[in-house]
C-alpha cells in the first residue's frame, strides 16, 4: 500500500502530461501512487506518455479512463475514490500543467507526520508564466515569481476572501475525504476553493515557507492548453459570488441536508463579511492610489510654479543687471563729456 496518492486530471494535453509525469517521477519521496484521470481523452496518448518513464516510475502510475467527461472539476473525484480504496494516508491534487520541486512530497509528508492535529499542509507557491511555442512542441518559460509573498500562515480568514493556496501546493489527509465528499461537480470552476473552505472547517492547515510548488500560467493560451483561471476568468468572478450566495441561502432557509459533514451554510456570514472586507480593502487601495496620484500631480504643479517664478526672477535679475550696466555706462560717458563739472557750475549759480 502506498502512503501518498497523487491525483492528476488530464484531457488531451500530452505536452503537459509528459512534464507532470516527469516531475512526480523525480520526487525524492517514492512511496506514492500516481493516479492519472484521463477525462475522456485519448488513452493511447496517455499510454505513450507513461511509457516514456523509467520502469520504476511506470510501476507507480495507474490510469483511470473516463469514457465520458463530466467536467473539469468532476474529473478529480475518480482519483479521490481510488485513493480511498487503496487506503493511502495522504492525497495531493497535481494538475497536468503544474509541477513540483523534487522535495515537495518529502517535506510535506514529514511535516504532516509530525503534526497529527493538522488536516493538511501547504507549501509556498511559485507563479510560473509560460507560453507554448508556435510549433506546439515545447513550453517556454517567460518569468516567475512568488505567489502571495506576504502570507506566512494558512488562515481561514484569508481563504474566505480569496484562495491563495492552489491545489498544487497542498497535501492533505486521506481520512478527510469521506467527510468532504470530493470536489463539487456542479461547479465549472472554484471547486478547489469550496473544497478547501470545507477542509479548513475540519482542522488547521500548516504552511511550509519554502517554494516547493509551481503554479503554471499561460496568459495567451486558449482551449485545452489554457488555464481555467485565465480562459475562464469571468466564471471565477461569477461563481465566487454564486458560492457565497448559496451559503447565505442555506443559512437563512436551513435547506442544507443535516449531516456531520462540513457544509457552506456555517460559513455564510464569514463569507459575506470577508467579501465586503475585501471590497473595502480594494476600495481603500484604489482611493490611496488616487491620493498618491493627486499628491504627485500637486507636487509636479508646485514644481512648475517654482520653476516659473525662478525663471521670471532670473529674467528680471538679468534685465536689472542690464539696466545697471547701462546706467553705469551712461554715468561714465557723462563724466567723460564734462557733464559733471557743468552741472556743478549750473547748480552753483542757482
Question: Whereabouts are the PLM-identified features?
Answer:
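Nucleotide-sugar donor-binding/catalytic module of glycosyltransferases
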Residues: 1-237
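C-terminal subregions of glycosyltransferases and related glycan-biosynthesis enzymes
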Residues: 159-160, 201, 216-340, 350
Amino acid at each position: 500500500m502506498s502512503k501518498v496518492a497523487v491525483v492528476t486530471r488530464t484531457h488531451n494535453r500530452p505536452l503537459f502530461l509528459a512534464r507532470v509525469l516527469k516531475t512526480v517521477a523525480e520526487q525524492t519521496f517514492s512511496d506514492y501512487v500516481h493516479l492519472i484521470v484521463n477525462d475522456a481523452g485519448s488513452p493511447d496518448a496517455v499510454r505513450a506518455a507513461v511509457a516514456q518513464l523509467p520502469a520504476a516510475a511506470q510501476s507507480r502510475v495507474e490510469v483511470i479512463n473516463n469514457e465520458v467527461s463530466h467536467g473539469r472539476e468532476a474529473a478529480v473525484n475518480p482519483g479521490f475514490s481510488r485513493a480511498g480504496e487503496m487506503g493511502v494516508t495522504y492525497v495531493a491534487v497535481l494538475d497536468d500543467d503544474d509541477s513540483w520541486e523534487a522535495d515537495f512530497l518529502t517535506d510535506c509528508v514529514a511535516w504532516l507526520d509530525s503534526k497529527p492535529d493538522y488536516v493538511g499542509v501547504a507549501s509556498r507557491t511559485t507563479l510560473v508564466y509560460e507560453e507554448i511555442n508556435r510549433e506546439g512542441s515545447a513550453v517556454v518559460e517567460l518569468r516567475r515569481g512568488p505567489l502571495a509573498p506576504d502570507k506566512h500562515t494558512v488562515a481561514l480568514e484569508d481563504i474566505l476572501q480569496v484562495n491563495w493556496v492552489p491545489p498544487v501546493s497542498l497535501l492533505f489527509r486521506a481520512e478527510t475525504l469521506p467527510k468532504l465528499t470530493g470536489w463539487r461537480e456542479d461547479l465549472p470552476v472554484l471547486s478547489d476553493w469550496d473544497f478547501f473552505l470545507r477542509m479548513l472547517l475540519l482542522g488547521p492547515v500548516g504552511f511550509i515557507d519554502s517554494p516547493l510548488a509551481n503554479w503554471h500560467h499561460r496568459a495567451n493560451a486558449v482551449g485545452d492548453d489554457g488555464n481555467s483561471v485565465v480562459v475562464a476568468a469571468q466564471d471565477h468572478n461569477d461563481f465566487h459570488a454564486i458560492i457565497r450566495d448559496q451559503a447565505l441561502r442555506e443559512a437563512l432557509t436551513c435547506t442544507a441536508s443535516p449531516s456531520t459533514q462540513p457544509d457552506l451554510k456555517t460559513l455564510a456570514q464569514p463569507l459575506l463579511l470577508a467579501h465586503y472586507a475585501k471590497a473595502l480593502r480594494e476600495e481603500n487601495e484604489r482611493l490611496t492610489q488616487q491620493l498618491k496620484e493627486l499628491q504627485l500631480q500637486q507636487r509636479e504643479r508646485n514644481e512648475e510654479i517654482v520653476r516659473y517664478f525662478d525663471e521670471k526672477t532670473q529674467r528680471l535679475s538679468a534685465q536689472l543687471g542690464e539696466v545697471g550696466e547701462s546706467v553705469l555706462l551712461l554715468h561714465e560717458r557723462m563724466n567723460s563729456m564734462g557733464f559733471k563739472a557743468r552741472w556743478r557750475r549750473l547748480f552753483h549759480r542757482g
